[in-house]
Amino acid sequence: MTRRRVLSVVVLLAALACRLGAQTPEQPAPPATTVQPTATRQQTSFPFRVCELSSHGDLFRFSSDIQCPSFGTRENHTEGLLMVFKDNIIPYSFKVRSYTKIVTNILIYNGWYADSVTNRHEEKFSVDSYETDQMDTIYQCYNAVKMTKDGLTRVYVDRDGVNITVNLKPTGGLANGVRRYASQTELYDAPGWLIWTYRTRTTVNCLITDMMAKSNSPFDFFVTTTGQTVEMSPFYDGKNKETFHERADSFHVRTNYKIVDYDNRGTNPQGERRAFLDKGTYTLSWKLENRTAYCPLQHWQTFDSTIATETGKSIHFVTDEGTSSFVTNTTVGIELPDAFKCIEEQVNKTMHEKYEAVQDRYTKGQEAITYFITSGGLLLAWLPLTPRSLATVKNLTELTTPTSSPPSSPSPPAPSAARGSTPAAVLRRRRRDAGNATTPVPPTAPGKSLGTLNNPATVQIQFAYDSLRRQINRMLGDLARAWCLEQKRQNMVLRELTKINPTTVMSSIYGKAVAAKRLGDVISVSQCVPVNQATVTLRKSMRVPGSETMCYSRPLVSFSFINDTKTYEGQLGTDNEIFLTKKMTEVCQATSQYYFQSGNEIHVYNDYHHFKTIELDGIATLQTFISLNTSLIENIDFASLELYSRDEQRASNVFDLEGIFREYNFQAQNIAGLRKDLDNAVSNGRNQFVDGLGELMDSLGSVGQSITNLVSTVGGLFSSLVSGFISFFKNPFGGMLILVLVAGVVILVISLTRRTRQMSQQPVQMLYPGIDELAQQHASGEGPGINPISKTELQAIMLALHEQNQEQKRAAQRAAGPSVASRALQAARDRFPGLRRRRYHDPETAAALLGEAETEF
């Protein structure tokens, strides 16, 4: 609400307060003398209200200088041939070859019941150039790999054998366009000969993979069919400005490089320029091409019949075949950019073929092919044509005109021609008029057909199109002109009606109840004050109290304002407006009848007394509204156009996820038989033994249960001991102590081993440390006169020592007595004679045994 309107409302409320202050509050009328209208309970735009006329409302005036503009078409039309090109979303595809050597180390466990693969490690290595030459020509490689890591050189040989030359053979695969050649298709997984041992087996496989790679513009990277990514442009040759984000020393180009197909081994193919990239785990190579090998545009459709409509700011290329319109944001054609020169040959060839097919009906004159770019990102190749019938009319007009210039080759104006030029406008009008011609134009030379009798479909389409647009535009122009004139007349009528009843006119304009008053040549509009709708009642009598001849011309109304308990009286106006005065009176007339509308009801007063209430629908409505009946444009079923097919959208992604996952699953299935879990393999074998032992114990009954409990107890004891030892070893102090003890035991064992070795090698020196010195003195004659004894005496002494040692052992055994086990065995022998030793009564046998016993001693 504006400041002026707020001031108007304040003045209005002040005036109402003065008026109400001057009035004396009335006592509520008895219910028998009043009637409550249903409009108090209805939602309406015109509730009961008090509208006070104020000279401080918003001021308005009616315009008297309305001008109706003229409406006319400003479009030019031209026929021609149209070719539409779209962005090429299909990536640039090219063949690549991958070289790699796969080293697979498998750890095999030789179990009791089954062998299992406990570990599998695979490494991939790139192939040097000297070996790629051999692989590309004769499909052979070396079955060994030499690598250096952290200063340590390692050599892996297939089957843990020797380095030899092996052949590559084709292998299977699932991905389309992928072909592999491998030297070793079977993994070396033979276990060792010793049971419960582990052996490591090595497999070296030379692998060549022929596949496709894809790269999208701007060619910052490309992806192979198997999912390998390379961060460089496939057109990079080491010298140009193409993208390259790989290691500088990993790329090189070889000229006149020869690569032989597997089926054509032994031939000498033509050399080519080939790029090589070392990725560390594999080597890639591909044939180098220039960027011109890829065209960024792709031909979509060619339309033989197209109408170019120039609207002033843009050109609409409308086709009848595709029911579509291509809109350009410029009216001037462009030259074909250098980046799109790849389509120039195709455009010239197609346009020439299309024009040859319709040259009997059309002529192109001196017009050339023009290119446009649409707002949707399409490139249009446009060749304007002129119907020969229209060209004939133009020639006849020029021949019959005395001041005409010498005839020239007929050609329609290009869409980029000046729209205001008179010859262009005349030519377009003649072309439209030619579509309405019903008689053929005479030929310009004998024996030549003008082609007007053929009635070509393109002329009919253009004529129908031009006629339809002309009729629609004329109809819309007439409607707009009539609408403007009607608004102008209505403005004049409303201006005159405000001189009679400004409140009604302004309320109809605002769409709600307002108070209006003319102040000279302007109108003051103010708001109305709503009353409490529930307190509004109508007096049944319209006679003036205390007078027999005077009556009210409008019924009396009792009401209260919102937030006010006082009851006031006024008179009911039109559209539920309440007047605060009772001055609308008249001389009472005999047999009078009045109808007053309040909401959706009409109150009927007969002889100035409320007679009845009827519905609003009971009174017929005077229809002053005239509806506009127009014929609508017929429906046009648009053809469904597919700019990019599903196959093109599918091929637009450089990552062929389906092929990558299929290839991965195929490779995973090849090693599924080898990938056995150690725990499962070993536990399965152990479970068989444990299950068999359990069945054996169950068959023994209580004895088996006792044995099982005993074994479980012993096993639990050992388990507790081992667990305690492990816990003690995990403790820092315990671990250090155990390590120190182990080191001490190792040192002690080494010392004892050395001493035992010396004892066995030099026993005399160990028993008599000074024997060497004594021998030296005896040899030099410096020592005392001691001479060694003879060998016979030495043997006698040794024999005496041996017998003495044996006698001491027997004496110790007799002194120790028999053991408990010996006594128990002897008691059993005495109780059971069968267990006694058999006594030999044979003298010869006894003598032989005694001889053996004496020999032992």
From Swiss-Prot:
Post-translational modification: A proteolytic cleavage by host furin generates two subunits that remain linked by disulfide bonds.
InterPro entries: Glycoprot_B_PH1, Glycoprot_B_PH2, Glycoprot_B_PH2_sf, Glycoprotein_B_ecto_C, Herpes_Glycoprot_B
Skewed-composition ranges (Pro residues): 404-415
Assembly with partners or alone: Homotrimer; disulfide-linked. Binds to heparan sulfate proteoglycans. Interacts with gH/gL heterodimer.
One GO term (biological process): symbiont entry into host cell
Keywords linked to the UniProt accession: Disulfide bond, Glycoprotein, Host cell membrane, Host endosome, Host Golgi apparatus, Host membrane, Host-virus interaction, Membrane, Signal, Transmembrane, Transmembrane helix, Viral attachment to host cell, Viral envelope protein, Virion, Virus entry into host cell
Localization (cell): Virion membrane; Host cell membrane; Host endosome membrane; Host Golgi apparatus membrane
TM region positions: 733-753
Domain of life: Viruses
A Pfam family of this chain: Glycoprot_B_PH2
Region entry Oligomerization, spans: 561-620
Annotated family: Belongs to the herpesviridae glycoprotein B family.
Compositional bias ranges of the Low complexity kind: 416-425, 845-857
Signal peptide segment: 1-21
Coiled coil: none
Protein name as annotated: Envelope glycoprotein B
UniProt-annotated stretches for the region Involved in fusion and/or binding to host membrane: 108-114, 192-200
Residues bearing carbohydrate: N76, N163, N290, N329, N348, N395, N436, N563, N629
Residues covered by region (Disordered): 398-453, 832-857
GO cellular component, one term: host cell Golgi membrane
Disulfide bonds: C51-C528, C68-C484, C141-C206, C295-C342, C551-C588
Residue numbers spanned by region Hydrophobic membrane proximal region: 678-730, 709-729
Annotated positions for site Cleavage: R432, D433
Membrane topology term: Single-pass type I membrane protein
Role this protein plays: Envelope glycoprotein that forms spikes at the surface of virion envelope. Essential for the initial attachment to heparan sulfate moieties of the host cell surface proteoglycans. Involved in fusion of viral and cellular membranes leading to virus entry into the host cell. Following initial binding to its host receptors, membrane fusion is mediated by the fusion machinery composed at least of gB and the heterodimer gH/gL. May be involved in the fusion between the virion envelope and the outer nuclear membrane during virion egress.
Segments on the Virion surface face: 22-732
